[in-house]
């Protein structure tokens, strides 16, 4: 090998070492730009008609999630000691990962827009982003339900959600509007927030309280994801086929996580999301062999794609079998641990999914 060829090889190895790392999903143990997000409505524009919330400004979308988490901490003692055990932490962590990985940006080819990048000021969310669209249903809808049930105080103000006119058909802008357009989704979020106090103050064991709260939360989250996947589908035309495959696999994963009542604490969610791809996928990307992604990211991508492909091949029966196997709080706890191993451990055999489902199903 020539000296120039050797230097090029060294440079390639160094470049791979620099870029092959897990996705960044936290700052000092908290969601991205968490501390920059206001913690109450007084920092948002207030008019004679109500509080003007612009969910296309990253900090304002994060504010809604921050208020929901702060307001629900008092009901989450069954999750474990400390406020970081609140399972709703997965929502702002998802939003932060989407920002860091470029998935809130304008996906239009050759777009010069900086919207969706940390370089924009203020940091904004592109209305054309698929994940930005999906996240709307996981931030605005639960926030409106939390306000409606009194879990989050509105200070006597009406909530006015701003939506760009060109994409208004894809979104709802108030509790009544969302309840009309998406009655099942809003009903499940309403039930979750309405039930929190009752469940947390019941005489049930903490183990059963935890399972009940997680069940209500994930029923609402899964309904939001399913609603969003339909409302946001047109945006997928702007992405590469590997990225679209990942988007679809993520929706499929939501069904598995939901059925297991996954306890999405800040530590657990952060670890899970750090294995997700740290950039938008391109046409040439083929997991598990994407050179500039880490081994863990490649493994997670491959497993998510495999699970989705098998489920589609079986006409959705893989998810159905998994749901049947998650038939008790004890089974669901085992299911959570299994999902962690399956997605996070590159050495864990994916083929064991079948045997796990069969074994757990027989114990129901």
From Swiss-Prot:
Disruption phenotype: Morpholino knockdown of the protein causes a small liver phenotype. Morpholino which can simultaneously block the translation of leg1a and leg1b, causes a more severe small liver phenotype with hypoplastic exocrine pancreas and intestinal tube as well. Glycans are attached at residue 70. InterPro entries: Leg1. One of its GO terms (cellular component) is extracellular space. The keyword Membrane does not apply. Keywords: Developmental protein, Glycoprotein, Secreted, Signal. Belongs to the LEG1 family. Residues 1-22 form the signal peptide. Its main location: secreted. Detected in all tissues tested, with the highest levels in serum (at protein level). At mRNA level, only expressed in liver. One of its GO terms (biological process) is digestive system development. This is Protein leg1b. It is found in: Secreted. PANTHER family: LEG1, PROTEIN LEG1 HOMOLOG. Involved in early development of liver, exocrine pancreas and intestine, probably through cell cycle regulation. In liver, its function is partially redundant with leg1a function. Pfam families: Leg1 (PF05612).
